[in-house]
Amino acid sequence: MAGRAPGDHASGHSDAALPMSIEIRNESGVSVDEPALAALARHVLDEMRIHPLAELSVLLVDGPTIADLHQRWMGEEGPTDVLAFPMDELRPPPPGSDRTDRVGYTSGDPGPATVLGDVVLCPEVATEQAREAQRPVTDELEMLCTHGILHLLGFDHAEPREHATMFGLQDQLLDSWRTERGPISDAVERDESG
């Protein structure tokens, strides 16, 4: 999985019941259940106790586009599965703290609204990785989206301790998502109209 890099932000709109702004833009040519992906992102942000007015953009792109971004921002050749471009710098809590400390506030005080940034996913790479891992593509996309959001929240996996923390949290978030909400649609097909 790719790391974090600075980047642009695009805001979106969500329904009035859940004011969190999560925009999903699919420019990949691959059909993805975008409302379900937005619901997953909302679940992750809710579980991480992110301010309900936070803004997040998820962009789905094709292989050449993510390869270009990967080279430009990470200095690495070839396509990757996920990139995260944070806007407001957030840092993970110190070891041993609970989730109420995630972004510097305590229970009952949601803290300031923030622009989290952009998560860029490549369904083509996700499909290939899912095939290699012998798991559903939807599971791979869920994992990559969650992974990218955690990068936006300041988590990284360069060091063994960071890796254990980030991937442990990622697994917990995905388990709670699948238990409470169910997986996103298994329909990931090439969009022939575009």
PLM-predicted stretches and their roles:
Residues 1-141, 150-194:
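An acidic/histidine-cluster motif and surrounding catalytic segment
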Residues 144:
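Residues within the DNA-recognition helix of helix-turn-helix
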